[in-house]
C-alpha cells in the first residue's frame, strides 16, 4: 500500500506534514509513504526513512496560483507529481494540505472521476455532541448542483460512511430550511423525491442546519455553496465559543477563576470534541482513487489522522466498490 504525499503543501509544510508521517508510521506498518518535495527539507523532520520514499521536486503550487494554469505549468510541483503517481499506478492514494482548487483540478484531470458519477464532491467528517460525527458533502467542489448531483452525493456519502467509518445503514439527510417534505428549493424537493424511492439508501428526509451537531444524521447532503458556508460557520462558531469562554473566565473575579480551574477538564473535553484534528481530511469522493485534502493549517496530528483515514479507504476498497456500484446502475 503506497500513499503519495505533497510534503510542500500547507501553511506549515514540510514540518507538520513530515511529523504527521512520523506519527502515522507507528501504526501503519503496511504503508509506504512517498514524500514529494525538497528532500533536504523533508529529511530535517524525519525520524527515520523506514517505509519512506522521497521524490525530489523543484516547484510548489501556492494558494495564490490559478489552479488550472498551475497544474499545466508547474508539472514538477510536489502536488502535481504526487497526484500523477496515482494516475500512473505508482501510488494508491494522495494527500495534500496545499491549494484546494489545484488538488481538485489535478484529481479531475489526472485521477479521473468514476464514469457514471455526474459530479465528484468534497466531503469531510464533522463533530457531533455524541462523538459519532457526521459526513457532509459537498463542501465546495461545486457551487451549483442539480437534484441528480445531490442523489449521487447521497450514494457516495453513504458508501463512505458504511465502508470507511463502519456505520451500519448510515442515516442520510438533505439540508433544507425545514424538516417537512414540502420544504426546500425545487432542487432539494426533486432530490427528496428520488431518494425517498431508493431502497439502497437509508434516507431519513430533510434536516435543518441547527440540528447537525446534535447527531441527527450520519451523512448530510447539500450543494457546494451551502456546504462550504455551513462548514465555515461551524468552524467559526467553535473558535469564537472557546475563546469567549476563556476570556469570560480570565476577566472574572477570583471565584470565577477558581471555578474556571475546576471545569478545566470538561472544557478540555469540549475542545477535543469540537476539534477536527482526529477526523482526517476532506475526501474528494467520486474519483477512481482516494484523493484527500488536509486543512492548510493542519497540525501533525491532523496529518496523521488523514493518513489513517486514507489507509481505511484503501483497506475497505471504497473507491473500487463505488466504481462497481455505479457500473451496475448504468446497465
From Swiss-Prot:
Its EC number is 2.3.1.274. InterPro entries: FA_synthesis, Phospholipid_synth_PlsX-like. GO terms for biological process: fatty acid biosynthetic process; phospholipid biosynthetic process. It catalyses: a fatty acyl-[ACP] + phosphate = an acyl phosphate + holo-[ACP]. It is an enzyme of class 2 (transferase). Signal peptide: none annotated. Belongs to the PlsX family. GO terms for cellular component: cytoplasm. Homodimer. Probably interacts with PlsY. Its main location: cytoplasm. Pathway: Lipid metabolism; phospholipid metabolism. It is found in: Cytoplasm. Keywords: Cytoplasm, Lipid biosynthesis, Lipid metabolism, Phospholipid biosynthesis, Phospholipid metabolism, Transferase. GO terms for molecular function: phosphate:acyl-[acyl carrier protein] acyltransferase activity. This is Phosphate acyltransferase. HAMAP family: PlsX (MF_00019). Catalyzes the reversible formation of acyl-phosphate (acyl-PO(4)) from acyl-[acyl-carrier-protein] (acyl-ACP). This enzyme utilizes acyl-ACP as fatty acyl donor, but not acyl-CoA. The gene is plsX.
